[in-house]
């Protein structure tokens, strides 16, 4: 259990890290619409953007700060006073300050020494704190940083006034075992303040690493709806929340039933479709075609489902196709209000399998056509 807490907080960065996805650019009204949906869903902290990027970005963050009623609104800021000023002018509740701590970033991106990085942390965190807002400090590329120096950077930020700290896996190189070690290492050496974890998905490990961090002492999960974000994306809000709830038995403030609609909204405004096999919110997440599976699910859904689809706003789908069996056909016919006689079931099953190999999707309209042809005594040796 993270830091003795039973409730894990959710920090959503869909409007900042998510929007950094190539090809995505949200208008002010679109950012506000997503922010309001995040607030309604129960997100604890909303990173609304990066105020120093542009006047429009600052305006959007300021509007979100005004309109959001429950969640804390956050702006990202580099370790500079001008970035802090821009964030403060956006009337945020929290400023998220970051600076890289890995040697590769210090040398090739910032061109500074470790000592200079510590000096900037002390100076700018203290300056930001003078605005009277909460301060979150991130050590960018923490997971490729020297551990002793990393701990020193966090201690410097905390002593300068940081209220919370974040551990970013900036290029997604962690494994669960390494993440467990890192979180324990930091917990043993730092004061017991809230610790965030921010995982990227370059190796497909973002959710697993986030959940592992929570199991080993992190209090706050930084996430993005639909796994969106730059490169391979970030830990998916819906997957982390479901895992925390169903697998760890811990609570969040998220209304689970809002997950599907939130996913759909973000997909629409980002212009990026949700993969059908996406966990929790994908169209296929609770879809069943294989006859054995359908039989089990119709008798007891938990035979092939780890959670109830309606609990996360999704729904169960029984799909007719190449792998369907009699139970699927009977269920589908009853849903149409058609009495499933043995002859009709056999006819439909044969038709479905023939159509499937022709890549024909057997939806409700096609199924009705199959039934009509059966009633007229016609064969199914044609493509619908």
From Swiss-Prot:
Residues 8-260 form the Pyruvate carboxyltransferase domain. Gene3D superfamilies: 1.10.238.260, Aldolase class I. It catalyses: 3-methyl-2-oxobutanoate + acetyl-CoA + H2O = (2S)-2-isopropylmalate + CoA + H(+). Its cofactor is a divalent metal cation. Its EC number is 2.3.3.13. InterPro entries: 2-IPM_HCS-like (IPR050073), AIPM/Hcit_synth_CS (IPR002034), Aldolase_TIM (IPR013785), LEU1_arch (IPR011830), LeuA/HCS_post-cat (IPR054691), PYR_CT (IPR000891). It holds the Pfam family HCS_D2. Keywords: Amino-acid biosynthesis, Branched-chain amino acid biosynthesis, Leucine biosynthesis, Metal-binding, Transferase. The keyword Transferase applies. GO terms for molecular function: 2-isopropylmalate synthase activity; metal ion binding. A divalent metal cation binds at residues 17, 198, 200, 234. GO terms for biological process: L-leucine biosynthetic process. CDD domains: DRE_TIM_IPMS. Pathway: Amino-acid biosynthesis; L-leucine biosynthesis; L-leucine from 3-methyl-2-oxobutanoate: step 1/4. Catalyzes the condensation of the acetyl group of acetyl-CoA with 3-methyl-2-oxobutanoate (2-oxoisovalerate) to form 3-carboxy-3-hydroxy-4-methylpentanoate (2-isopropylmalate). NCBIfam families: LEU1_arch, PRK00915.1-2. Homodimer. Belongs to the alpha-IPM synthase/homocitrate synthase family. This is Probable 2-isopropylmalate synthase. It comes from Pyrobaculum aerophilum (strain ATCC 51768 / DSM 7523 / JCM 9630 / CIP 104966 / NBRC 100827 / IM2). The lineage of its organism: Archaea, Thermoproteota, Thermoprotei, Thermoproteales, Thermoproteaceae. The gene is leuA.
């Amino acid at each position: 259990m993270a830091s003795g807490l039973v409730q894990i907080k959710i920090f959503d960065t869909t409007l900042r890290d998510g929007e950094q996805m190539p090809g995505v650019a949200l208008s002010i009204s679109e950012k506000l619409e997503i922010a309001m949906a995040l607030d309604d869903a129960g997100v604890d902290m909303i990173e609304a953007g990066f105020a120093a990027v542009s006047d429009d970005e600052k305006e959007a963050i300021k509007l979100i700060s005004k309109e959001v009623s429950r969640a804390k609104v956050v702006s990202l800021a580099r370790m500079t006073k001008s970035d802090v000023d821009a964030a403060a002018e956006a009337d945020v509740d929290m400023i998220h300050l970051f600076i890289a701590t890995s040697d590769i970033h210090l040398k090739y991106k910032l061109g500074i020494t470790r000592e200079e990085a510590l000096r900037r942390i002390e100076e700018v965190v203290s300056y930001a704190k003078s605005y009277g807002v909460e301060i979150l400090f991130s050590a960018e590329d923490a997971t490729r940083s020297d551990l002793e120096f990393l701990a020193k950077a966090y201690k410097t930020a905390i002593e300068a006034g940081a209220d919370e700290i974040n551990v970013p896996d900036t290029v997604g190189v962690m494994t669960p075992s390494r993440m467990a070690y890192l979180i324990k290492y930091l917990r043993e050496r730092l004061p017991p303040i809230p610790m965030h974890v921010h995982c990227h998905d370059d190796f497909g490990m973002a959710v697993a690493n986030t959940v592992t961090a929570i199991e080993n002492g992190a209090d706050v999960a930084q996430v993005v709806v639909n796994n969106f974000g730059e490169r391979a994306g970030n830990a998916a809000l819906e997957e982390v929340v479901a895992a925390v709830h169903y697998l760890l038995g811990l609570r969040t403030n998220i209304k689970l039933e809002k997950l599907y609609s939130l996913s759909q909204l973000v997909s629409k405004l980002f212009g990026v479709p949700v993969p059908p096999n996406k966990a929790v919110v994908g169209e296929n997440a609770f879809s069943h075609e294989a006859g054995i599976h359908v039989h089990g699910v119709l008798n007891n859904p938990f035979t092939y489902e780890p959670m109830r689809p309606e609990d996360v706003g999704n729904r169960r789908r029984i799909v007719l196709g190449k792998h369907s069996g009699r139970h699927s056909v009977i269920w589908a016919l009853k849903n149409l209000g058609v009495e499933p006689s043995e002859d009709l079931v056999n006819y439909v099953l044969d038709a479905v399998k023939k159509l499937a190999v022709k890549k024909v999707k057997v939806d409700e309209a096609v199924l009705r056509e199959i039934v009509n042809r059966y009633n007229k005594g016609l064969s199914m040796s044609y493509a619908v």
